[in-house]
From Swiss-Prot:
GO BP: any one term: translation
Keyword field contains Repeat: no
InterPro entries, per the entry: Ribosomal_uL11, Ribosomal_uL11_bac-typ, Ribosomal_uL11_C, Ribosomal_uL11_C_sf, Ribosomal_uL11_N, Ribosomal_uL11_N_sf
GO CC, one annotated term: cytosolic large ribosomal subunit
Family of the protein in this entry: Belongs to the universal ribosomal protein uL11 family.
The entry's keywords: Methylation, Ribonucleoprotein, Ribosomal protein, RNA-binding, rRNA-binding
Native organism: Exiguobacterium sp. (strain ATCC BAA-1283 / AT1b)
Keyword RNA-binding applies: yes
GO-annotated molecular function: large ribosomal subunit rRNA binding; structural constituent of ribosome
UniProt name for this protein: Large ribosomal subunit protein uL11
Amino acid sequence: MAKKVSKLVKLQIPAGKANPAPPVGPALGQAGVNIMGFCKEFNARTQDQAGLIIPVVITVYEDRSFTFITKTPPAAVLLKKAAGIESGSGEPNRKKVATVKRDKVREIAELKMPDLNASSVETAMLMVEGTARSMGIVIED
């Protein structure tokens, strides 16, 4: 018989830098998960993606065991890395902060495809371009 799920915990943690301090500790402590076990496993799985923020969905079962799935980094994080900026524009309609080439947007869209609700790379590109626009990043051909 399958284990019963008691809780789903969603977090965004820097790759390879999970530790028992907030936000990881309190979120997993409430669910009764072995925090150090999760941290070691997460850090081992994400050590090659250093510098990126990785969304993770942790499934906690009634016997306090857990499994987790790592997702692709948010489009905003990938766009900031591609543009070489620290943060997006506070006024994206008035003040543009950077430019990104369309081929870089395609690269990001292809990376994000498994997590996006898109049927083709072109529609995924439109989603990534929308994120860029809302951050004050201009897309160049």
